[in-house]
Amino acid sequence: MGKCVGVADTTFARVDMGSVAEEVLRRRLPGYRIVRHTVPGIKDLPGAAKRILSMGCEGVITLGWVGRREADKLSYLAASVGLIMVEVLTGKIVIDVTVHEDEAEAPEELAAIAVDRARKHAENLAALIREGPEALVKHAGMGLRQGYPDAGPIK
């Protein structure tokens, strides 16, 4: 199959974060095939990630959207545990990107958070694949944020 990387996203999301991630990965990982798998909701992301990784991909970015209700938050918890299990059991990179609908009131602000978070985490995935596990060491403790301005380090 050659080198590949995965993007898993949902139809529940209100922003097409998958396309944002795809664009970054195409630019940062030339020569890699991008496998995209869109599923209905966040509880479906662990299965999608596992299927993508089973195809031989080196890593996957999952892009979920959590609604405002308690049931949505519990669904996210289940999905998060599932994604952790996929990462541990496969030994491959799984970057879990999630936007919680209660992070902002204005739809425009939510969209900006989603795009920024998807872009920055896709950059992280590309760096980890290109440079290996030490790729992000230079950023440790720097207070970097995805979806918001960086907080900066505490001196």
UniProtKB/Swiss-Prot annotation:
The UniProt record lists the keyword Transferase: yes
UniProt GO cellular component terms: riboflavin synthase complex
Keyword NAD belongs to the record: no
Keywords (A to Z) from UniProt: Riboflavin biosynthesis, Transferase
The name this protein goes by in its record: Riboflavin synthase
Species of the source: Aeropyrum pernix (strain ATCC 700893 / DSM 11879 / JCM 9820 / NBRC 100138 / K1)
InterPro entries referenced in this protein's UniProt entry, alphabetically: LS/RS (IPR002180), LS/RS_sf (IPR036467), Ribfl_synth_arc (IPR006399)
GO molecular function ontology, one term from the record: riboflavin synthase activity
